[in-house]
Amino acid sequence: VGEDNAQMYYTLTYKNRPVIEESKLGVLIENQLFESALGVPNDTCHFWCENLKLTGTERRKADETWKPVYGERAEIRDCYNEMTLKFKKGEGDGAQEGGYDKRKNYFMNIIVRAYNEGVAFRYHFPETTNGLFLHIIGEQTSFTMPQGTMAYYERWAQGPYALRPLEGWGKEESERPLTLKLPDGLSVALLEAEMVDYARGKFRLSADKPSTLETSLYSSVDIISPYSTPWRVIMVGERPVDLIN
Protein backbone atom coordinates (compact mmCIF):
# COMPACT_ATOMS: atom_id res chain seq x y z
CA VAL A 1 0.00 0.00 0.00
CA GLY A 2 1.27 3.47 -0.87
CA GLU A 3 2.36 5.98 1.76
CA ASP A 4 -0.94 7.86 1.48
CA ASN A 5 -2.92 4.60 1.99
CA ALA A 6 -4.78 5.38 -1.24
CA GLN A 7 -3.35 2.83 -3.66
CA MET A 8 -2.45 -0.86 -3.53
CA TYR A 9 0.65 -2.14 -5.35
CA TYR A 10 2.37 -5.46 -5.97
CA THR A 11 5.66 -6.75 -7.38
CA LEU A 12 6.76 -10.16 -8.67
CA THR A 13 10.19 -11.77 -8.88
CA TYR A 14 11.33 -15.15 -10.21
CA LYS A 15 14.51 -16.59 -8.66
CA ASN A 16 15.44 -13.05 -7.56
CA ARG A 17 14.93 -11.73 -11.10
CA PRO A 18 12.36 -8.94 -11.58
CA VAL A 19 9.27 -9.91 -13.55
CA ILE A 20 6.69 -7.29 -12.53
CA GLU A 21 7.90 -4.02 -11.05
CA GLU A 22 5.70 -1.96 -8.71
CA SER A 23 2.22 -2.08 -10.29
CA LYS A 24 -1.28 -1.03 -9.28
CA LEU A 25 -4.05 -3.24 -7.95
CA GLY A 26 -7.72 -2.34 -7.58
CA VAL A 27 -11.24 -2.30 -8.99
CA LEU A 28 -12.97 0.83 -10.29
CA ILE A 29 -16.53 0.99 -8.94
CA GLU A 30 -19.21 3.67 -9.33
CA ASN A 31 -22.05 3.09 -6.90
CA GLN A 32 -23.28 6.66 -6.42
CA LEU A 33 -26.67 6.12 -8.09
CA PHE A 34 -27.32 2.92 -6.14
CA GLU A 35 -26.27 4.48 -2.83
CA SER A 36 -28.34 7.61 -3.43
CA ALA A 37 -31.44 5.48 -4.02
CA LEU A 38 -30.89 3.91 -0.59
CA GLY A 39 -30.24 7.22 1.13
CA VAL A 40 -26.61 6.34 1.81
CA PRO A 41 -23.98 9.13 1.64
CA ASN A 42 -21.94 8.81 -1.55
CA ASP A 43 -18.37 7.65 -1.45
CA THR A 44 -16.09 10.68 -1.79
CA CYS A 45 -12.89 8.75 -2.65
CA HIS A 46 -11.30 9.48 -6.02
CA PHE A 47 -10.91 5.72 -6.55
CA TRP A 48 -13.14 3.13 -4.88
CA CYS A 49 -10.21 1.12 -3.49
CA GLU A 50 -8.74 4.09 -1.64
CA ASN A 51 -8.41 3.76 2.13
CA LEU A 52 -9.30 0.09 2.34
CA LYS A 53 -8.52 -1.41 5.74
CA LEU A 54 -6.83 -4.80 5.91
CA THR A 55 -8.80 -6.81 8.48
CA GLY A 56 -7.17 -10.22 8.19
CA THR A 57 -5.48 -12.87 6.08
CA GLU A 58 -6.02 -16.56 5.44
CA ARG A 59 -3.55 -19.07 4.02
CA ARG A 60 -3.98 -22.55 2.62
CA LYS A 61 -2.21 -25.08 0.41
CA ALA A 62 -3.70 -27.25 -2.31
CA ASP A 63 -2.31 -30.21 -4.24
CA GLU A 64 -4.95 -32.00 -6.30
CA THR A 65 -5.63 -33.21 -9.81
CA TRP A 66 -8.47 -32.72 -12.25
CA LYS A 67 -9.40 -34.37 -15.53
CA PRO A 68 -9.93 -32.16 -18.60
CA VAL A 69 -12.68 -32.88 -21.11
CA TYR A 70 -10.02 -33.02 -23.81
CA GLY A 71 -6.33 -32.21 -24.14
CA GLU A 72 -2.85 -33.68 -24.23
CA ARG A 73 -2.92 -34.87 -20.60
CA ALA A 74 -5.38 -37.23 -18.94
CA GLU A 75 -4.89 -35.47 -15.58
CA ILE A 76 -3.65 -32.03 -14.63
CA ARG A 77 -2.01 -31.28 -11.30
CA ASP A 78 -3.22 -28.17 -9.48
CA CYS A 79 -0.63 -27.34 -6.80
CA TYR A 80 -0.37 -23.91 -5.20
CA ASN A 81 -0.07 -21.82 -2.04
CA GLU A 82 -2.98 -19.42 -1.54
CA MET A 83 -3.37 -16.28 0.54
CA THR A 84 -6.60 -14.29 0.93
CA LEU A 85 -6.29 -10.64 1.94
CA LYS A 86 -9.50 -9.36 3.55
CA PHE A 87 -10.34 -5.67 3.25
CA LYS A 88 -13.12 -3.49 4.64
CA LYS A 89 -14.30 -0.15 3.29
CA GLY A 90 -16.33 2.19 5.49
CA GLU A 91 -17.17 2.52 9.16
CA GLY A 92 -20.28 2.43 11.32
CA ASP A 93 -23.33 0.16 11.39
CA GLY A 94 -22.92 -3.28 9.92
CA ALA A 95 -19.13 -3.25 10.07
CA GLN A 96 -18.88 -7.02 9.97
CA GLU A 97 -18.49 -9.42 7.10
CA GLY A 98 -21.87 -10.71 5.95
CA GLY A 99 -23.87 -7.79 7.31
CA TYR A 100 -23.73 -4.64 5.18
CA ASP A 101 -26.47 -3.01 7.30
CA LYS A 102 -27.52 0.32 5.79
CA ARG A 103 -24.87 -0.23 3.08
CA LYS A 104 -22.29 1.78 5.01
CA ASN A 105 -19.67 -0.92 4.63
CA TYR A 106 -18.19 -2.95 1.83
CA PHE A 107 -15.92 -5.97 1.98
CA MET A 108 -13.50 -7.11 -0.69
CA ASN A 109 -10.93 -9.88 -0.73
CA ILE A 110 -7.87 -10.27 -2.92
CA ILE A 111 -7.10 -13.95 -3.48
CA VAL A 112 -3.52 -14.74 -4.53
CA ARG A 113 -2.24 -18.14 -5.66
CA ALA A 114 1.46 -18.89 -6.13
CA TYR A 115 2.41 -21.77 -8.44
CA ASN A 116 5.80 -23.03 -9.57
CA GLU A 117 4.81 -21.67 -13.00
CA GLY A 118 3.66 -18.22 -11.87
CA VAL A 119 1.03 -16.29 -9.95
CA ALA A 120 -2.73 -15.74 -10.23
CA PHE A 121 -4.90 -13.24 -8.36
CA ARG A 122 -8.50 -12.07 -8.40
CA TYR A 123 -10.89 -9.75 -6.56
CA HIS A 124 -13.70 -11.36 -4.57
CA PHE A 125 -16.77 -9.73 -3.01
CA PRO A 126 -18.04 -12.01 -0.21
CA GLU A 127 -21.59 -13.27 0.15
CA THR A 128 -23.92 -11.09 2.21
CA THR A 129 -27.23 -11.73 3.91
CA ASN A 130 -29.06 -9.16 1.79
CA GLY A 131 -26.95 -9.07 -1.37
CA LEU A 132 -24.87 -6.19 -2.61
CA PHE A 133 -24.97 -4.46 -5.99
CA LEU A 134 -21.74 -3.16 -7.53
CA HIS A 135 -21.26 -1.28 -10.81
CA ILE A 136 -17.72 -2.07 -11.99
CA ILE A 137 -16.44 0.31 -14.65
CA GLY A 138 -12.89 -1.00 -14.89
CA GLU A 139 -9.81 -2.24 -13.09
CA GLN A 140 -6.64 -0.56 -11.89
CA THR A 141 -4.78 -3.84 -12.40
CA SER A 142 -1.54 -3.09 -14.24
CA PHE A 143 1.73 -4.80 -15.14
CA THR A 144 4.92 -2.72 -15.13
CA MET A 145 7.57 -4.69 -16.97
CA PRO A 146 11.36 -4.27 -16.84
CA GLN A 147 12.67 -1.67 -19.27
CA GLY A 148 13.42 -3.25 -22.64
CA THR A 149 10.65 -5.87 -22.52
CA MET A 150 9.27 -6.90 -25.93
CA ALA A 151 5.68 -8.04 -26.55
CA TYR A 152 4.26 -10.46 -29.12
CA TYR A 153 1.53 -7.98 -29.96
CA GLU A 154 -1.72 -9.30 -31.44
CA ARG A 155 -4.54 -6.87 -32.13
CA TRP A 156 -7.35 -9.45 -32.37
CA ALA A 157 -7.90 -13.17 -31.70
CA GLN A 158 -6.31 -15.42 -34.35
CA GLY A 159 -4.61 -12.34 -35.79
CA PRO A 160 -0.96 -12.03 -36.86
CA TYR A 161 1.70 -11.54 -34.18
CA ALA A 162 4.28 -8.77 -34.23
CA LEU A 163 7.22 -8.45 -31.83
CA ARG A 164 6.98 -4.87 -30.56
CA PRO A 165 8.47 -2.82 -27.72
CA LEU A 166 6.19 -1.53 -24.96
CA GLU A 167 5.91 1.89 -26.57
CA GLY A 168 4.20 3.58 -29.50
CA TRP A 169 0.96 1.61 -29.40
CA GLY A 170 -1.20 4.71 -29.26
CA LYS A 171 -4.75 3.73 -28.35
CA GLU A 172 -4.35 0.20 -29.73
CA GLU A 173 -4.92 -2.80 -27.48
CA SER A 174 -3.37 -6.26 -27.54
CA GLU A 175 -5.28 -9.52 -27.20
CA ARG A 176 -4.80 -11.95 -24.37
CA PRO A 177 -2.94 -14.05 -23.67
CA LEU A 178 -0.02 -11.70 -24.26
CA THR A 179 3.45 -13.26 -24.42
CA LEU A 180 6.40 -11.11 -23.40
CA LYS A 181 10.16 -11.43 -23.80
CA LEU A 182 12.06 -9.89 -20.88
CA PRO A 183 15.53 -8.39 -21.42
CA ASP A 184 17.15 -10.99 -19.13
CA GLY A 185 15.77 -13.84 -21.25
CA LEU A 186 12.72 -14.84 -19.20
CA SER A 187 9.44 -15.49 -21.02
CA VAL A 188 6.19 -14.23 -19.50
CA ALA A 189 2.53 -14.69 -20.43
CA LEU A 190 -0.30 -12.48 -19.17
CA LEU A 191 -3.77 -13.98 -19.35
CA GLU A 192 -7.15 -14.27 -17.67
CA ALA A 193 -9.07 -17.33 -16.50
CA GLU A 194 -12.54 -18.24 -15.21
CA MET A 195 -14.31 -15.25 -16.73
CA VAL A 196 -17.99 -15.59 -15.75
CA ASP A 197 -20.52 -12.79 -16.38
CA TYR A 198 -17.69 -10.28 -16.81
CA ALA A 199 -16.31 -8.12 -19.60
CA ARG A 200 -13.34 -9.45 -21.56
CA GLY A 201 -10.09 -7.69 -20.92
CA LYS A 202 -7.29 -6.62 -23.24
CA PHE A 203 -3.98 -4.87 -22.63
CA ARG A 204 -3.18 -1.26 -23.42
CA LEU A 205 -0.09 0.81 -22.70
CA SER A 206 -0.25 3.31 -19.86
CA ALA A 207 -0.14 6.93 -20.97
CA ASP A 208 1.61 7.92 -17.74
CA LYS A 209 4.05 5.15 -16.80
CA PRO A 210 6.67 3.64 -19.16
CA SER A 211 6.69 -0.11 -19.89
CA THR A 212 3.32 -0.52 -18.16
CA LEU A 213 0.37 -2.54 -19.43
CA GLU A 214 -3.10 -1.73 -18.12
CA THR A 215 -6.19 -3.95 -18.04
CA SER A 216 -8.80 -2.56 -20.44
CA LEU A 217 -12.35 -3.93 -20.06
CA TYR A 218 -14.70 -4.02 -23.04
CA SER A 219 -17.60 -2.64 -20.98
CA SER A 220 -18.81 -1.98 -17.47
CA VAL A 221 -20.18 -4.86 -15.39
CA ASP A 222 -23.09 -5.04 -12.93
CA ILE A 223 -22.69 -7.70 -10.25
CA ILE A 224 -24.37 -8.87 -7.06
CA SER A 225 -22.31 -10.47 -4.30
CA PRO A 226 -21.01 -13.08 -3.87
CA TYR A 227 -18.88 -12.55 -6.94
CA SER A 228 -15.32 -13.14 -8.11
CA THR A 229 -13.66 -11.33 -11.00
CA PRO A 230 -11.58 -13.36 -13.48
CA TRP A 231 -8.14 -14.53 -12.47
CA ARG A 232 -5.31 -12.29 -13.65
CA VAL A 233 -2.53 -14.76 -14.41
CA ILE A 234 1.22 -14.18 -14.78
CA MET A 235 3.13 -17.20 -16.08
CA VAL A 236 6.94 -17.24 -16.07
CA GLY A 237 9.39 -19.56 -17.82
CA GLU A 238 13.12 -19.79 -18.44
CA ARG A 239 12.30 -20.57 -22.08
CA PRO A 240 9.22 -19.86 -24.24
CA VAL A 241 8.38 -23.59 -24.35
CA ASP A 242 8.06 -23.60 -20.55
CA LEU A 243 4.88 -21.56 -20.86
CA ILE A 244 3.06 -24.45 -22.54
CA ASN A 245 4.72 -27.34 -20.73
Name each region found by the language model.
Residues 1-245:
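N-terminal accessory beta-strand-rich subdomains and adjacent acidic, glycine-rich linkers
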